Amino acid sequence: MLPESDSMRTQPEQKKDTTFSGGIRYFMKERSNIVSKKYVYLFSEGNGSMRELLGGKGANLAEMTSLGMPVPHGFTVTTEACTRYYEDGKTIAPEIEAEIFEFVSKLEALAGKKLGDKENPLLVSVRSGARASMPGMMDTILNLGLNDEVVEGIAKLTQNPRFAYDTYRRFIQMFADVVAEVPKEYFERAIDLMKQKKGVKQDTELDADDMKQLVEQFKALYKGHIGRDFPTEPKVQLMESVKAVFRSWDNPRAIYYRRQNGIPSSWGTAVTVQMMVFGNMGNDCGTGVAFTRNPATGEKKFFGEFLVNAQGEDVVAGIRTPQSIDELKQLMPEVYDQFLEIATRLERHYKDMQDMEFTIERGKLFMLQTRNGKRTAQAAMKIACDLVDEGLITEEQAVLLVDPSQLDAFLHDQFNPAELKRAKILATALPASPGAACGQVVFDAETAKEWVAEGKKVILVRLETSPEDIEGMHISEGILTVRGGMTSHAAVVARGMGICCISS
């Protein structure tokens, strides 16, 4: 017979307190037993095991924060908030909005800056982050919090009006594209016309007055398409941006990518809101993407690219051809050494090749992302074997690092050497993704889809690819981009798909 526990013994019946104060005490006790769902987490409150809730980006930012790495302060709005957004008819519930603003206040306290303040303004990025990596498929907005008054404050604070107005025009362009769906081509055309007018080739050659003019042109473009002025209230900018990132989970390119990669539509995306650090303040600033090993070959060598005086989207978009990460060692040796040390720590911590985003502001390094890097089939095999030889993983773990679907692409097509000798070389470029391809040249993704449907083989040729090109890229034999580099959008996506790609 089991011994009688204390809870099993007969207890004397307690008399209920039916007074008003007793009722209040009962209500408060019951209320305290109800645990409300938490939809927002500071980076310092999460960790790398929380991918389902915080998404890959949010979980890894939290993990890097816990490891003491130089990560700008921020918070993550969970995937459950995204699910709730769709359940509520594509609206953000009042309690979730209130929680987001509560965490904005916490972020302001951590940063020592205030959103919308003219004297010491906080600017933030708003970025997507699904639990599975979907490079470039969803949306990002940088420099949020700017308006006509704040930009003047930043110009005064930094003594750098060119930087302030460059940052402002970038924000208007990204907000208009992502939130209001104003085609980005209108803004790019305005920039090209300004460069022609000034007789320069690069955005970086435009001065402060040029940037001011672009800001006014961009605001006029926004109003012309939307029918109302560009929003000036930072909290309105923030909530509209969070909604836009949630919506981007269901944009056509994201849906296509999920189908191709077996990612459930029910997962949703998290949203990271992070204090901005700036790579576009001058020549002691920059931004880049790097891998702990070569993602094309698997070679154990630090691999990546960066741009001086730029923001992160400039690198992945291929707007300018970046410099090799090796050149950073010459330009900023202390930053390079610190970055190399962090990269080594991250690979050992995650026990896999890492794909990292970083920004340098006034000679100081900041980590903005890390994730397991996309790689070719050959690279996957070499990296898995090397990690075993280095004692980082077991043979059983190595098998799991190679995606079975990649094995078909393991033997990339190669040209017949005799044919190569006879062929006339028209152009050479960077080997962004290995292989060989033959086909008819097409200049846009829509034409690629039409021609492939007619049974033709095509080579997709673009100035630079964008996420909107994903379907055309997937069905092409090969990809050629005029601008970009080894870490551009075209390169990263092509390697993941096992498609030959060269990028100038």
Task: Say what each PLM segment does.
Residues M1-S7, P12, T18, G22-I24:
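N-terminal amphipathic/hydrophobic targeting modules at extreme N-termini
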Residues K16-D17, R31:
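Intrinsically disordered, glycine-rich low-complexity segments
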Residues K29-A423, E450, K456-I459, S466-E471, ...:
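Nucleotide/phosphate-binding sheet-loop regions of phosphoryl- and nucleotidyl-transfer enzymes
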Residues P431-E468:
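Extended, non-globular alpha-helical segments
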Residues V461-L463, T481-V482, S504:
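Structural motif
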Residues S476-R483, C501:
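A short, small-residue-rich loop immediately preceding and capping a beta-strand
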Residues G498-S504:
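Acidic, glycine-rich catalytic loops of TOPRIM or P-loop NTPase phosphate-binding modules used
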